[in-house]
A protein has these predicted regions:
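The feature represents the membrane-entry module of six-transmembrane cation channels
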Residues: 202, 373-374, 423, 474
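Conserved alpha/beta catalytic core and glycan-binding cleft of carbohydrate-active enzymes
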Residues: 159, 362-364, 379-546, 553, ...
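Short glycine-biased active-site loop of nucleotidyltransferases that positions the nucleotide triphosphate
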Residues: 113, 258-263, 307-314, 431-432, ...
Length: 690
């Protein structure tokens, strides 16, 4: 209660005084900085650490899976004093300070305390509140100061600004209990009870955006062109339900400085990008979609990170998160840096981040980007540009161990949330069980099918017979992994043309007939499905992240009918369990005819354990109408339930309007057969009835 004057003991700004007491006592400082009002503050160094020895030891060992609960900026009350506890891992730093809008960005004011030999720095700053801007000022061993964003920040400034923002993400009231409770069934991966999964891949900033308004001086008057997460949730959920998709997969929403990176060069792994709102807004987005029965999968990038000065690169003046040797630490394709997975604290950072999105945001799956680049030390590199492993091979043993560790812990803590790998090579057992030497993913993108099938579809129909094997080859290896058939964003950029644009044909009608046949084959082929936004209505211009999809195309008959077709095809998929239930069980698929090379046609069955569910699928990849006898599995009546050549979808209307009764005539090695009309450039489905 009686102020005691303090004397400046050092020109760096240290003050001290003598107080004649033998026991600890509570005290505050009365401080006056130049040109500022007098302040009364608590001593930041009088508060106990929030870390236990166990916390730090587990982080040091790479197994503190909830490290995000303490690392970063945490609003809290300690000993009755409100403030924010800051902490950061920077073992090679000479000094670390918290700077922000609460201390004039002055690194002398709040220098952090080093916690033992763990490389963690910490300080509790009284009076700092939610919404404050901050960074870490790191003084390197060379004496150079650097300003770094918080790797564990829950919220970040909108680009081009790069400060972290103190956030409390504990207050959102979730109401998706019913979805979370039933998610194990909704997303079942059981071999005999595989759930339907039809994913709509999208980029939040260009699926739909606002029209920019300008005043008479040409100045923008309506601010951001982006909709808020909450606004997008309402618009997107209506569209997804209308179009009969089951999930959305969102291109990375973690904070990133460069729009043109599409989110794949992340600087804020724990921050949903502020382009579309706050963390609470993003929680609302996921919660709302869950309540509408829509799953949410996030793209996640554990393979590399950008060189931006405010990010992870050379974080404490050393190569902390990346390898020091550029042959190990530099990514040649993207100009980015590769994580040093052998460092426990680095793998802990990434593992806890994946768990964070499942825990705090209720995400239904993580799709890991560029897994192939993680698995191979020589990925994208020439001889002499990479370092072999201890056995002389090109396998990245540290990355393999990291993936197994991550997948093991993730599935243990979130058994009903999915792990999906974008892996483009023939690496074995990507979706194999960890106990059997697999990597432990639930699903793997089928890049082989995508490449082969698109090359086949790009051919003039009259030349497709020469590449017929590309149509059927995927079934030779389909059951080696749990594959998702993907037609993703990567296939509609960089001069590749959109999916509609890839199709052959002198007219739009011919192109769209090809596209309908392609989608029909995809949706009846075993495996889960993914389609990139805009392709469902046949957008002709390549995707551009800076503009909205061309929704105005739906004013044209050919595009509106294409959208109507996609909607109906997705409904077919959902309505018939034979199209998904045994996706990864060989009993769920059977060829009837895969040798009609000259006609470029295939006939196959999709099945469940119940004979009554059996579907006969016929695909014709030529513009020729065939009168065809096909073998069928059972005696009975077969009704055409779907035809991509229907006039309502823009087709010519050739089909089988009446049910067909089988005859006892051996065709395609079957005792029973049907005589049908095969529409041109089309997929048709028949349902069996006794």
């Amino acid at each position: 209660k009686n102020p005691v004057a303090m004397q400046c003991m050092d020109e760096a700004g240290f003050f001290a005084c003598f107080v004649g007491r033998k026991q600890e006592f509570k005290y505050k400082f009365i401080v006056k900085y130049d040109n500022e009002a007098e302040q009364t503050i608590s001593d930041p160094y009088s508060f106990d650490s929030i870390y236990s020895e166990e916390d730090l030891s587990k982080f040091d060992a790479g197994i503190n899976y909830e490290i995000y609960e303490k690392m970063g900026a945490k609003p809290m009350t300690i000993s009755g004093v409100e403030g924010v506890n800051f902490s950061v891992w920077a073992p090679e730093a000479m000094r670390v300070s918290v700077v922000g809008d609460f201390n004039l960005w002055d690194g002398r004011r709040h220098q952090m305390e080093r916690l033992g030999d763990f490389g963690v720095f910490e300080i509790f700053i009284p009076g700092v509140s939610v919404g404050s801007l901050y960074k870490f000022e790191i003084k390197t061993k060379k004496g150079e100061p650097m300003l770094k964003s918080d790797p564990y920040a829950f919220y970040s400034e909108l680009r081009p600004n790069t400060a972290s923002i103190v956030a409390d993400i504990s207050g959102f009231e979730w109401s998706d209990e019913a979805w979370m409770k039933d998610r194990e069934n909704i997303q079942s991966t059981k071999i005999n009870e595989s759930a339907a999964m039809n994913i709509y891949e999208l980029h939040l900033g260009s699926w739909i955006r606002k029209e920019m308004q300008y005043d008479e001086n040409g100045e923008e008057v309506n601010g951001s062109v982006f909709y808020n997460y909450r606004e997008i949730a309402h618009k997107l959920s209506v569209y997804i339900k209308k179009m009969n998709y089951t999930h959305v997969e969102i291109m990375p929403v973690m904070e990133h400085p460069l729009d043109a990176s599409w989110g794949y060069q992340v600087t804020g792994y724990y921050s949903p990008t502020s382009r579309y709102g706050t963390p609470d807004d993003f929680m609302y987005f996921i919660n709302y979609l869950h309540k509408k029965g829509i799953g949410v999968i996030l793209d996640w990038v554990p393979a590399h990170f950008p060189r931006d000065l405010h990010g992870l690169a050379c974080f404490d003046g050393s190569h902390l998160y990346e390898h020091a040797d550029p042959r190990q630490g530099a990514h040649p394709h993207w100009g980015t840096l590769i994580y040093n997975y052998a460092r426990p604290q680095v793998s802990n950072f990434l593992i806890s981040n994946a768990l964070f999105w499942a825990d705090k945001y209720h995400v239904d799956g993580i799709r890991m980007d560029a897994v192939a680049s993680m698995l191979y030390l020589d990925y994208g590199k020439n001889s002499g540009e990479w370092v072999a492993n201890i056995y002389g091979g090109n396998e990245n043993l540290d990355a393999i161990e990291f993936l197994k560790h991550l997948n093991s812990i993730y599935k243990k803590k979130n058994p009903s949330s999915l792990l999906i790998a974008e892996e483009s090579t023939a690496w074995p057992k990507v979706s194999g069980d960890l106990n059997e030497g697999g990597l432990g993913f639930d699903y793997k993108w089928n890049m082989g099918w995508m490449n082969d099938f698109l090359e086949f579809m790009k051919l003039d129909p009259y030349f497709r017979s020469g590449d017929y094997n590309a149509l059927t080859f995927s079934l030779f290896y389909h059951y080696s992994e749990n594959f998702i058939l993907v037609l993703s964003h990567d296939e509609v950029v960089h001069g590749k043309a959109t999916l509609a644009g890839k199709m052959p044909g002198a007219t739009q009608e011919e192109k769209f007939a090809n596209l309908r046949a392609a989608y029909g084959y995809m949706m009846t082929h075993p495996g889960k499905k993914l389609l990139f936004m805009g392709q469902e209505f046949g957008q002709m211009n390549e995707w551009n992240e800076n503009v909205s999809l061309e929704w105005n195309l739906l004013d044209y008959d050919i595009h509106s009918k294409m959208q109507k077709y996609s909607k109906a095809l997705n409904k077919l998929y959902l309505d018939y369990p034979a199209l998904y239930k045994l996706d990864y069980n060989p009993d769920g698929f059977e060829w009837i005819n895969c040798t009609s090379k000259d006609e470029s046609t295939v006939v196959f069955l999709r099945k469940t354990e119940n004979e009554e569910d059996t579907l006969v699928v016929v695909c014709n990849f030529t513009p020729v109408v065939y009168e065809r006898e096909i073998g069928v599995p059972f005696k009975g009546t077969y009704t055409e339930i779907f035809n991509s050549d229907d006039k309502k979808y823009g087709g010519s209307g050739v089909g089988n309007k009446r049910a067909k009764k089988s005859v006892k005539k051996k065709v395609d090695g079957r005792e029973n057969s049907l005589k049908i009309k095969v529409p041109p450039m089309a997929m048709v489905v028949f349902k069996w009835d006794k």
